[in-house]
Amino acid sequence: MASIEEIAHQIIEQQMGEISRSQPEISQTALMDGTTQRIQLVPSESSVSVPQRIQIVTDPQTGQKIQIVTALDQSGASKQFILTNNDGSLPSKVILTRQDSSQGKVYLTTPDAAGVNQLFISTPDVPAQHIQILSDTQCLDQNLNKQLVELCVVCGDKASGRHYGAVTCEGCKGFFKRSIRKNLVYTCRGSKDCVINKHYRNRCQYCRLQRCIALGMKQDSVQCERKPIEVSREKSSNCAASTEKIYIRKDLRSPLAATTTFVTENKTSRTTSLLDSGMLVNIQQSGVKNESILITPNKVDACQGDLSTLANVVTSLANLNKSKELPQTNTELSIIESLSNGDSSLSELAQDDQSNSEVTRAFDTLAKALNQSENSAQGSSECVGSNSNLTDANVEIEGPLLSDAHIAFRLTMPSPMPEYLNVHYICESASRLLFLSMHWARSIPSFQSLGQENSISLVKACWNELFSLGLAQCCQVMNVETILAAFVNHLHNSMQHDKLSADKVKLVMDHIFKLQEFCNSMVKLSVDGYEYAYLKAIALFSPDHPGLENVSHIEKLQEKAYMEFQDYVTKTYPEDTYRLSRLLLRLPALRLLNAAITEELFFAGLIGNVQIDSIIPYILRMETSDYNSQIIGLTV
């Protein structure tokens, strides 16, 4: 196979032999995409009256085809060319200096140009080869002695070595590995010829993957690598299952700032405004599946896992109970044990010291919750059922229902924030909000006076309303708009790939729009902490839920919450006559939100098919000090 230097010799020799000809010559040159294009040869300088031979090269950073035209004569040690664009504009001199036969590279110097470029050349009898163009104003010998920096053949970034058969950077290496390992399917929103360079490589995953393959990255090399150990289990049909990973650019904190609401007169236009916001990059399979070890219940004792979410504290209770064969005195325990069928997983193994302390702290919390369910006779003021004797309907309610201590509602987000917003991070944030909402309810003395069964029944009936009010209150901290937009994009892609039915997508999409509209309306009303607290209390003490006992007492608690709410609004906003009415009219919208869909969106990736109702009793049994220690320990 001829080298590029030999081809250059042939080109110059043919050039000298063609000077005596009077007719232009036509040459066929193979382009990088494998097609053949007929090109009219043009002279490189005015002194030469006949056409010259040319080579076509492609700049990987711009995707632009460039002509290298032979010029001058063959005297001297160096072969000289003219580098021009396709239209012949912006010419610059290129000197073929030498070839490194060991690496199959040809080094060119362009003294007229600025910066360092990297091109590829292809001819009918020579495959694509690596050409480094070195631009410098210094002398040629000085340039050749410099250490040339290898660039990624895909995006032009600084290469870290040869990966999967091609010289690439770490970014393209990781992208190619994830794409091939997980059999990801991408879609190009353009014409499948997007520019892939250091700055725009994340804009189109389809074109980036095609470029990786075209430039020599081998899929077989990835498939031969060791894959993580995993336990087979049924894939959840939930629309936010843990096998999905939502990739969103981290620098866009408020991608929907220009979209004041999801609801417009045209449903299609509101969806398009989300999908075209430029914030959503791609949805890929979860790194949890490939970067963690899924364990079965009989391995819980042997593994020192990183219990990195509050929800895992609760779900681990089932595994702990089953592995140690603890006695079951609560029917809820048998329900939550379904978590041990494969839906509970521990994150990537952390350092031993840190893992041991976290596991110890988590298991201590779980043991306390379990002991409270087994030894209800030993209940104290910390236990929900400690005041179960105060449930008579005739008990007078003394003092205010809510104190200043119930106004504070501070959500601590997981730290550090991951580079990409993934399902695990969303579920962890949502679980913290759910725990905080339930412990807020438990801190109300009147709530504890209802007794264990009634308090659990109330929270089971209204947890979705408390959670939605918490989302609205913490929408800035949680960046709710970004999360909901990610869900919309996920549904859009799932429908395109026939993963979800149109009816299912419509049902979930309507739920998302209702939730977004509710959050937007609360932000527009500038609801303060006291108002949020009273709205939650009114939603919590709702006597119209089926299966409640002492309904009249619950009704009195709701009336008291309303009266205190009215007094506060009247004193704080005396000029806003209709403020109380506007706030109360937002509560019916919460009843329109489907609790099952909320579970799918925010929690299914973490607890699988287990319902929130099953873990509510254990959340309510956690002591406040244990809850706070989990938050502090996992955030530091």
Curated annotation (Swiss-Prot):
Which SMART domains has this protein been placed in?
HOLI, ZnF_C4
Q: Is the keyword Secreted in the record?
A: no
InterPro entries, per database record: NHR-like_dom_sf, NR2C1/2-like_DBD, NR2C1/2-like_LBD, Nucl_hrmn_rcpt_lig-bd, Nuclear_hormone_rcpt_NR2, Nuclear_hrmn_rcpt, Znf_hrmn_rcpt, Znf_NHR/GATA
Task: Name the principal localization, coarsely classed.
Answer: nucleus
**Residue ranges of the NR C4-type zinc fingers?**
152-172, 188-207
User: Gene3D superfamilies, per this entry?
Assistant: Erythroid Transcription Factor GATA-1, subunit A, Retinoid X Receptor
The record's comment on protein family reads: Belongs to the nuclear hormone receptor family. NR2 subfamily.
In its UniProt entry, what is this protein called?
Nuclear receptor subfamily 2 group C member 1
* Organism name: Xenopus tropicalis (Western clawed frog)
Q: What is the lineage of its organism?
A: Eukaryota, Metazoa, Chordata, Craniata, Vertebrata
